[in-house]
Structure formats: C-alpha cells, structure tokens
C-alpha cells in the first residue's frame, strides 16, 4: 500500500514538474525567433545528453541493472528535482536576505552556498525513490542510479537556463 502511495506521489510530482518545465514553451508568449534559439540550444545540449543516456544504458546492460530503476531515476531527476529546487532556492534566498545582514559571510556567498544545500538533497531524494521502487543491492547499480538522477537534474537545469 505504501509503495503504491509513493508511486502516486511520484507521478503527481512528475506531472507538476512536466507542466512547470514546459509552460514557457506552450504558453505562446515567445516569438518565432525565440523558439528558433530554443531549438538550436536544445540541439547543442543534445550533444552531451544523448551520449550520457547511451552511456547509462550501456553500463546498465553491462552491470545488469534493471532498466526500470534507471527510468525512475531519470524521470525523478528531470521532472521532480528541477522545479522543487527552483522554488526552494527562491525561498532560501528570500530567507537569507530577510534574516541576515549584508555584511555577514553567509549573505555574501549565499548563491554559492545555498544551491548545493538545496539541490543535493533533492537529487538524493530522486535516487532514494528509484531504489525504493525497484530495489537494488550492488554498489555498481547504486552508483549508476545516482549518476542517472544527477544526469536528469542536469538536463532539467540546462533546459531552464535556455528559457
């Protein structure tokens, strides 16, 4: 029962993330030249995305990792961690600017310090969800699932920087 509830929560968060990530493309607010720039930038990003996915697929076959766990990790990394990290970074930035003086060390380096504190636990959550839904035991499998969740987050982050 708890596994089904977790799966439904994952699907809900992934649906929200898919809507959040594609909203700027589907709203019709961009000009034709902006869509052209987005298309060209996407083609450039595919130069590392496709080899990365093929490498994960190759290592998954070689190390006998269940493909479903890699799919969960990739979807979690792409559609869940990205939009939550965006909101969490905004909230943490607002908190730091409201509660700390501009002379404090943490205030000055907030951009460099808060992003890892917010984003890394979210990548860990995508990893933990994937291995909870499809249990894996060997260290090679766990490493590949973690790499896949990180690759998914990187894809999401690069797609957001284009728009």
Per-range role (PLM):
Residues 1-163:
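Hydrophobic alpha-helical segments at protein termini of multi-pass membrane proteins
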């Amino acid at each position: 029962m708890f596994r089904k509830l977790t799966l439904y929560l994952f699907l809900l968060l992934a649906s929200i993330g898919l809507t959040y990530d594609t909203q700027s493309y589907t709203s019709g607010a961009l000009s034709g030249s902006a869509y052209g720039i987005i298309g060209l930038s996407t083609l450039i990003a595919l130069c590392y995305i496709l080899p990365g996915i093929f490498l994960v697929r190759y290592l998954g076959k070689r190390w006998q990792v269940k493909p479903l766990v890699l799919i969960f990790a990739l979807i979690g990394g792409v559609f869940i961690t990205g939009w939550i990290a965006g909101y969490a970074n905004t909230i943490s930035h607002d908190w730091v600017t409201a509660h700390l003086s501009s002379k404090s060390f943490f205030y000055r380096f907030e951009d460099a310090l808060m992003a890892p504190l917010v984003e890394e636990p979210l990548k860990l959550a995508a990893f933990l969800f994937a291995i909870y839904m499809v249990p894996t035991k060997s260290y090679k499998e766990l490493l590949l699932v973690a790499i896949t969740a990180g690759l998914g987050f990187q894809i999401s982050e690069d797609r957001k920087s284009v728009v």
